[in-house]
Amino acid sequence: MDITNIKEMNYEEVFSITITVDKPILIGQDDIVGRRQLIPIISGKVSGNNFNGKVLPGGIDSQIVRPDGKCELSARYAIRLDDGAAIYIENNGIRTVPDEYIEAVKSGEFVDPNAYYFRTIPTFETYSPKYKWMMNHIFVCCASRLPENVLLKFYKIS
């Protein structure tokens, strides 16, 4: 047996979510820690191959934007699919921005998504037997902050 012959990872896009958010709620800010903010998740659309639905209201994205522009985020929200199944999503990650874009991002200006790194690691909770498989796989998410919403693309790692 060759224990060095480990199966390589592959990934496949399973679905995407376009999320509509409200204005950030500022919790606090200083020059050492950064800016803590809560961003309400209002709604959104789920799209995929036989995986479509909507984002339920009531979610929140808790962020801390460090003085160097790095954003540490932790979002909690739920989706309801067209077949009636509900899935709770916990999505933790980071967004790092090159120095030349830090001030634009801090002020809320639009920055080309290809100019920065925005990745998350989502986990899922569901009571639907049809989607329990999601709880047993690792996913990664590529994200983009667009002028009107946030685009998340979810990839299953195999």
Swiss-Prot record:
Domain of life according to the entry? Bacteria
Question: What Gene3D superfamilies has UniProt attached to this entry?
Answer: 2.40.160.20
The cross-references to InterPro entries, in alphabetical order and at most eight, read: UPF0311
Q: Which residues form a coiled coil?
A: none
Q: Which Pfam families match?
A: DUF3237 (PF11578)
Recorded family membership:
Belongs to the UPF0311 family.
Q: Which HAMAP family match?
A: UPF0311 (MF_00775)
| Protein known as | UPF0311 protein CA_C3321
Upper taxonomic lineage? Bacteria, Bacillati, Bacillota, Clostridia, Eubacteriales
